[in-house]
Amino acid sequence: MASSMMASTAAAVARAGPAQSSMVPFNACRSSVPFPATRKANNNLSTLPGNGGRVSCMQVWPPEGLKKFETLSYLPPLSVEDLAKEVDYLLRNDWVPCIEFSKEGFVYRENHASPGYYDGRYWTMWKLPMFGCTDASQVIAEVEEAKKAYPEYFVRIIGFDNKRQVQCISFIAYKPT
């Protein structure tokens, strides 16, 4: 058996020989110019790159007092038309709208130092996911109903992709005053 394996290996090596002699190495990604050995010293500080003077209009989010909630929390509260546009985007991507509500609109820990089920990551779902929903007005009507039932709670809209089994978008639809 060992002699038959050696014979088949020798035949395979003999066949591979002529094919390799006709192959040419691939050089398309190589540069013909070598890398520079030294860098040019830039002692002139007036030529440093800038952002066109836009720094003066940037602000820093204050770390105390203003909580960030979800994806669009840095914007002013969304109007009904803005919510409808977001829900239309959600529906165009074939995501299932879900409405959730919670007393606290952010992650918090009151029972233990390590993360757990009751630390604000999981919100209560309002009714069932809206499978088969094709109109943003249906989702807006459910948000209004949730606001009426729980006026002191946060309400958020989630877009769930049931093909990939992931949550793709989440934003606050209502903040209590």
Curated annotation (Swiss-Prot):
Name assigned to this protein: Ribulose bisphosphate carboxylase small subunit, chloroplastic 3
Family statement drawn from the similarity comment of this UniProt entry: Belongs to the RuBisCO small chain family.
Organism of this sequence: Lemna gibba (Swollen duckweed)
Protein function: RuBisCO catalyzes two reactions: the carboxylation of D-ribulose 1,5-bisphosphate, the primary event in carbon dioxide fixation, as well as the oxidative fragmentation of the pentose substrate. Both reactions occur simultaneously and in competition at the same active site. Although the small subunit is not catalytic it is essential for maximal activity.
GO biological process, one term: photorespiration
UniProt entry keywords in alphabetical sequence: Calvin cycle, Carbon dioxide fixation, Chloroplast, Photorespiration, Photosynthesis, Plastid, Transit peptide
CC per GO annotation: chloroplast
Expression induction or repression: Accumulates to low levels when grown under continuous white light.
Molecular function per GO: ribulose-bisphosphate carboxylase activity
